């Protein structure tokens, strides 16, 4: 389902639905496939509303911590900038969208009632003539930040004046966990691109992809020493460590992650059942 999240009616409905969980005391959202929604849409439609609800119902959370949101911007690439394009990169979503674009936003029902979106196969564009163009125009280079780093060996107050309030899964770091040295080197050189990389959610592998070795469609296939080094870095480095079920035991090492309709689940890296859960660590 491709929801029209640029329509206020749709966005408000989603906020109402998911806001119910915030009212119950849920302390954060992981938003799947966030890269399919523009940063402008997040900054206009969702982040402000969810943040406000989080503040309003903070007493429902046990520790009253700020409501936390992070998303999956799936950038399967070895560099922190995805194919040379800022607006397709994970870090882009951690920065606030330009105010001049936010001011031009019109998601009202009155606007959408004027739009007739014919399918491309029938000669139409398949998109509206304003909101889509507005989202695509949000492609300016991002600033850099020292929020992650100490300055002259000392802690300093971070500057969040340009932060979007949204955080991301650290896909570039995940992709470089073929070995810990590569992951560490990438973070040292690339963390300045995020508003604050200490809030990046870090995992070595997941149910979707393994770290880049020769093919990310397979579970990690290295030895125990290499795996232990990766996990040690994940738990002691900057960011929020995220352990996918099975990672701690080298689950289904080297297995293809997903065969789709071409083979049984038992032959994949997603065989989360029965004896498969014992893992392969000696």
Show where each model-derived region lies:
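A broad, structure-centric signal for solvent-exposed, well-ordered loop/edge residues
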Residues: 10, 210-211, 256
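Active-site-adjacent "subsite" loops/lids of carbohydrate-active enzymes
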Residues: 1-24, 34
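Short glycine/proline-rich turn/loop motifs
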Residues: 1-6, 24-25, 204-217
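Active-site-proximal helices and loops of the catalytic beta/alpha 8
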Residues: 16-19, 27-196, 200, 217-225, ...
């Amino acid at each position: 389902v491709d929801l029209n999240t640029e329509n206020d009616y749709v966005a408000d409905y989603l906020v109402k639905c998911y806001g119910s969980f915030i009212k119950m005391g849920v302390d954060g959202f992981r938003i799947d496939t966030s890269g399919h929604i523009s940063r402008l849409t997040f900054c206009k439609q969702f982040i402000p509303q969810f943040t406000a609800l989080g503040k309003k119902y903070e007493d429902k959370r046990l520790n009253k911590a700020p409501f936390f949101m992070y998303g999956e911007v799936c950038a399967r690439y070895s560099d922190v900038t995805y194919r040379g394009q800022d607006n397709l990169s994970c870090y882009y979503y951690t920065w606030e969208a330009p105010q001049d674009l936010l001011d031009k936003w019109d998601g009202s029902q009155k606007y959408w009632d004027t739009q007739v979106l014919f399918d491309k196969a029938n000669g139409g564009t398949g998109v509206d003539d304003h909101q889509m163009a507005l989202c695509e125009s949000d492609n300016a280079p991002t600033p850099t930040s020292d929020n992650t780093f100490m300055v002259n060996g000392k802690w300093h107050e971070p500057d969040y004046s340009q932060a979007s309030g949204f955080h991301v899964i650290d896909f570039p770091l995940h992709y470089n966990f073929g070995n810990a040295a590569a992951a560490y080197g990438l973070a040292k050189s690339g963390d300045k691109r995020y508003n604050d990389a200490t809030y990046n959610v870090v995992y070595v592998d997941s149910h979707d992809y393994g770290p880049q070795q020769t093919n990310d469609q397979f579970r990690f296939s290295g030895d125990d020493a290499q795996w232990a080094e990766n996990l040690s870095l994940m738990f002691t480095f900057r960011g929020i460590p995220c352990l996918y079920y099975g990672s701690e035991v080298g689950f289904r090492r080297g297995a293809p992650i997903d065969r789709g309709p071409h083979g049984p689940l038992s032959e994949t890296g997603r065989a989360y059942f029965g004896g498969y859960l014992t893992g392969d660590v000696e």
